[in-house]
């Protein structure tokens, strides 16, 4: 068993780390304060090939793998969790289902644009009345001739309002419940598609989260993803990989908080020596580092399994569960190490703490992860 990263993975880590340090970090606090999405940053990520990391060159990607992708999300999230989740949602939630379930025509048209970063992607599953219970959605799609007509709404859409392409799930046969859900590719310019309110959030504030609405939205049948009734399966398989993207985001947030806390602890003097030398602080730092490393290993393992074509659903759920809890614990401890300064916006740890909370909620709450894991253990 080899735990070393390949030369390619190390090269991608350095590339993204340098980009994050010089292009993302300088404006992270300002974008958070202003709740501002920076499309130019997305273009710069595209120019570096980050928007197509795991996809074949035939579809505009760079032909790497899912481990390279989670490394990129981790490095971005160390300085800005909003930028990390922008890439995660774009690749895991929009591009992946197209790659896995799209026709050749759909992949050539849409996956290529997404991989090249010419278009931004999003995923629309959650509704106001169906969060964890995705099978109870109310959005409908009625087949009329060569089109489907969608009616309903979705909430908490990452990249909402800035995305060009949405993977949308709607009910085509209410009698079949989960087996009556179908997936569609919806472009932002389709007639009857609207962006609703933008959420005011605790964290990841420069990542837009919006409602989207369908009012007799006409979607050509050629834009159906998979067969009728396969939507729920597509959604669940998509979330298997998406969870590991969020785990990578959580690891990045936690590492960023630890780096800041460690530097501060070395510089801050109390009672004649740095607080890093005080056992109470030193032990906190040791625990934080250990939790992060364990979470990182789980995340990389899940990515390796997916890249190797092996079952990865359980590993992905475990990585998100562990990394989400780690991010919340580590960022809270980082604020504590900073003391009163940690509670101010003069330092980034309060932002890390606010950003960490969402990793325990979206793409399946911690409770849902435990449910997924326990069911797989019982099989």
Swiss-Prot record:
Keyword flag Flavoprotein: yes
Pathway note: Lipid metabolism; fatty acid beta-oxidation
Reaction equations catalysed: a 2,3-saturated acyl-CoA + A = a 2,3-dehydroacyl-CoA + AH2
Family: Belongs to the acyl-CoA dehydrogenase family.
Molecular-function GO terms, alphabetical: acyl-CoA dehydrogenase activity; flavin adenine dinucleotide binding
Cofactors (names): FAD
Keyword annotations: FAD, Fatty acid metabolism, Flavoprotein, Lipid degradation, Lipid metabolism, Oxidoreductase
SUPFAM superfamilies membership: Acyl-CoA dehydrogenase C-terminal domain-like, Acyl-CoA dehydrogenase NM domain-like
Alphabetical GO biological process terms: fatty acid beta-oxidation
Superkingdom: Bacteria
The protein's name: Acyl-CoA dehydrogenase
Induction annotation: Repressed by FadR in the absence of LCFAs (fatty acids of 14-20 carbon atoms). When LCFAs are present in the medium, they are converted to long-chain acyl-CoAs, which antagonize FadR as to its binding to fadR boxes on target DNA and thus derepress transcription.
Matching PROSITE patterns: ACYL_COA_DH_1, ACYL_COA_DH_2
Enzyme class: oxidoreductase
Gene3D superfamilies found in the cross-reference section: Acyl-CoA dehydrogenase/oxidase, N-terminal domain (1.10.540.10), Butyryl-CoA Dehydrogenase, subunit A, domain 2 (2.40.110.10), Butyryl-CoA Dehydrogenase, subunit A, domain 3 (1.20.140.10)
EC number, as in UniProt: 1.3.99.-
Function: Involved in the degradation of long-chain fatty acids.
Source organism of this protein record: Bacillus subtilis (strain 168)
């Amino acid at each position: 068993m080899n735990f070393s990263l390949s030369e390619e993975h190390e090269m991608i880590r350095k590339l993204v780390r340098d980009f994050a340090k010089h292009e993302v970090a300088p404006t992270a606090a300002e974008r958070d304060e202003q709740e501002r999405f920076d499309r130019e940053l997305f273009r710069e990520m595209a120019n570096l090939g980050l928007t197509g990391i795991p996809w074949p060159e035939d579809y505009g990607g760079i032909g790497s793998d899912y481990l390279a992708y989670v490394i990129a999300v981790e490095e971005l999230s160390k300085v800005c969790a909003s930028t990390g989740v922008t890439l995660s949602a774009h690749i895991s939630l929009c591009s992946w289902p197209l790659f896995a379930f799209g026709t050749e025509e759909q992949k050539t048209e849409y996956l290529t644009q997404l991989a090249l970063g010419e278009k931004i992607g999003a995923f629309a599953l959650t509704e106001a009345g169906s969060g964890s219970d995705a099978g109870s959605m109310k959005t409908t799609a009625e087949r009329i001739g060569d089109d489907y007509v969608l009616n309903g709404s979705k909430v908490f859409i990452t990249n909402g309002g800035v995305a060009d392409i949405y993977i949308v799930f709607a009910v085509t046969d209410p009698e079949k419940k989960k087996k009556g859900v179908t997936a569609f590719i919806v472009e932002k310019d389709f007639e009857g598609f609207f962006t609703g309110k933008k959420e005011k959030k605790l964290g990841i504030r420069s990542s837009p989260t919006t409602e989207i609405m369908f009012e007799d939205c006409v979607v050509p049948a050629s834009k159906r993803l998979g067969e009728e009734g396969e939507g729920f399966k597509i959604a669940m398989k998509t979330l298997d990989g998406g969870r590991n993207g969020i785990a990578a985001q959580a690891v990045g947030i936690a590492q960023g908080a630890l780096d800041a806390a460690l530097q501060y602890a070395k510089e801050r003097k109390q009672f004649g020596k740095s607080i890093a030398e005080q056992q109470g602080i030193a032990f906190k730092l040791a625990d934080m580092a250990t939790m992060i490393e364990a979470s990182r290993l789980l995340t990389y393992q899940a990515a390796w399994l997916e890249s190797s074509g092996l079952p990865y659903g359980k590993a992905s759920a475990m990585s998100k569960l562990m990394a989400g809890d780690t991010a919340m614990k580590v960022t809270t401890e980082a604020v504590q190490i900073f003391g009163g300064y940690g509670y101010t916006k003069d330092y980034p740890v309060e932002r890390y703490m606010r950003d960490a909370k969402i990793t325990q909620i979206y793409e399946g709450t911690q409770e849902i992860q435990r449910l997924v894991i326990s069911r797989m253990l019982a099989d």
